[in-house]
């Protein structure tokens, strides 16, 4: 059993609470669409490199009328990084021991006019402590109103903490969520941040400050995405629209399997395979 300190416990509790609220909000949308779909939860455990308890998590997934496939995962894991992987992790080169807790969400929607979405926030401990995460919108058929509303809500969350956050983190998302082999973006962006390091008071941003920002990212997502879904879920669509959706999902698959840091981290740390690949859509197409 993992032994958590006060900061690790607080972060884990927040991610689990946010999961519960997001799942309830998504189930409410399904009820409004005359669907009885609900999340099904599957707990999982992992072993560390020595075969001892290394934490685990809960994978939540729903297949519904509005949400064709949505997964909301929370995990809390710890152990030692493999030597070849430790060198690439902030603060792990000198000591491979780590702790990580976080929430990861991907929603693929039934109506091609409702954008897919990704949200992830996390807290890691190596010889350093930091937060990372973000949220990005992934429409097969972009709608400027949705894009503007999504970015405006994230901009407000960032501005409440640091005026440089949104310019920095939106550019980071623009650069990160990009498929180099195709020369195209994965979606219409959002924010992405990593290595938001926590310092002692007087030495830099504290745990409390960075944790407050990370909570506000989660709150911003919970506020804006259900509004976008409700605005678009009854939009009529054509076979051509569905073809665009399936082709876009193919690009999404390519990014997540080739470039996504979370996928690589999960595979390198003995994470739950079903939870790691939860981000993949139920159907996709390539032409």
Residue ranges and their predicted role:
Residues 157-213, 227-230:
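Long, charged, mostly alpha-helical binding arms that flank functional sites
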Residues 3-90, 201-258:
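Gly/Pro-rich turn-and-neighbor structural signature
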Residues 109, 263-287:
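Long, contiguous binding/interaction regions
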Residues 83-85, 114-116, 143-146, 265-267:
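Short helix/loop capping segments that flank catalytic or ligand/cofactor-binding pockets
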Residues 56-133:
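Internal mixed beta-strand/loop scaffold within catalytic domains of large alpha/beta enzymes
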Residues 89-91, 121, 150-154, 270-274:
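Short intrinsically disordered coil segments
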Residues 7, 109-111, 125-127, 137-144, ...:
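A generic structural motif
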Residues 127-169:
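Compact, glycine/acidic-enriched structural inserts
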């Amino acid at each position: 059993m993992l032994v958590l300190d006060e900061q690790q416990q607080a972060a884990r509790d927040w991610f689990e609470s946010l999961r519960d609220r997001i799942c309830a909000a998504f189930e409410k949308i399904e009820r409004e669409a005359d669907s009885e779909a609900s999340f099904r939860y599957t707990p999982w455990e992992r072993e560390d490199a020595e075969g001892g308890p290394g934490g685990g998590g809960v994978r939540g997934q729903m297949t519904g009328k509005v949400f064709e496939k949505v997964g909301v995962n929370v995990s809390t894991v710890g152990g030692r990084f493999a030597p070849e992987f430790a060198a690439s992790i902030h603060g792990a080169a000198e000591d491979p021991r780590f702790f990580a807790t976080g929430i990861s969400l991907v929603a693929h929607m039934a109506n091609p006019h409702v954008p897919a979405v990704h949200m992830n926030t996390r807290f890691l401990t190596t010889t350093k402590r930091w937060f990372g995460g973000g949220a990005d919108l992934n429409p097969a058929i972009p709608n400027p109103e949705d894009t503007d509303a999504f970015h405006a809500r994230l901009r407000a969350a960032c501005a409440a903490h640091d005026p440089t956050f949104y310019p920095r983190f939106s550019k980071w998302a623009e650069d990160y969520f990009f498929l180099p082999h195709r020369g195209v973006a994965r979606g219409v962006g959002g924010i992405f941040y990593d290595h938001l390091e926590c310092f002692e008071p007087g030495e830099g941003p504290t745990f409390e400050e960075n944790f407050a920002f990370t909570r506000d990212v989660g709150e911003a997502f919970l506020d804006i995405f259900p509004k976008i879904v409700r605005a678009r879920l009854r939009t009529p669509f054509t076979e051509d629209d569905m073809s665009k959706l399936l082709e876009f999902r193919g690009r999404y698959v390519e990014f997540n399997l080739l470039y996504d840091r979370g996928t690589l981290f999960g595979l390198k740390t003995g994470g739950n395979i079903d939870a790691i690949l939860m981000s993949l859509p139920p159907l996709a197409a390539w032409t």
